[in-house]
Amino acid sequence: MASRLLDHLTAGFTASLVWDAFDNYHDHEQYWTIYGLIRTGLRAFTPKKRYYAQKQVFRFVRPGFVRLGVICDAPDLRVLAFSSQDRQQVTLVGINTGLAPLHLNVQLIGFPIELRQKQAAYYRTSETENCHCIGRLPVNGGNWPFTGIDAQIPPACIFTLTTLG
């Protein structure tokens, strides 16, 4: 489901919605749908993995953000970038579809110096994590030649790097 959301954003769509937010019964078709973001129980509703994967985008790509160009040579790494119109905030969302960990170094070219002095929060959803904050990374790393946001991306995960508070 997160991959489809990235497909839509890549194609130029500016919004997305979830039709069935939770698993539910359709009287007219007389069947249960199980495509929701939230699992329906007798007395509890539980977020599914797809909820946390969608949260990586919905929480950190704010209304009014614009999509940025990204150059990524890794075939198993899909990355989209967004910034506020004043270029004071930036959010990158990506998916490592491969079976191996990847090294990611993000160079923010043409952004104000104030942004380059911030830190980026690193969130990840994987088999064992649910939009978990891994930590904070400097936007301007000091490890030459990796002078941007420097992150290790494990296999089969969706991640977000964001300068939002």
Model features per residue range: what roles?
Residues 1-59, 66-77:
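Aromatic/acidic polysaccharide-binding cleft in carbohydrate-active enzymes
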Residues 3-6, 77-81, 93, 147-149:
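Generic recognition of flexible, low-complexity loop/linker segments
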Residues 14, 50, 88-90, 102, ...:
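Structural beta-strand/beta-sheet cores of well-ordered domains, especially the beta-sheet scaffolds
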Residues 18-22, 95-97, 125:
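Active-site-proximal beta-strand/loop segments in catalytic clefts of secreted hydrolases
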Residues 73-115, 156:
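Carbohydrate-binding surface patches
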Residues 101-135:
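Beta-strand-rich binding/interaction modules
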Residues 139-165:
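C-terminal beta-strand-rich structural cap/linker in extracellular carbohydrate-active enzymes
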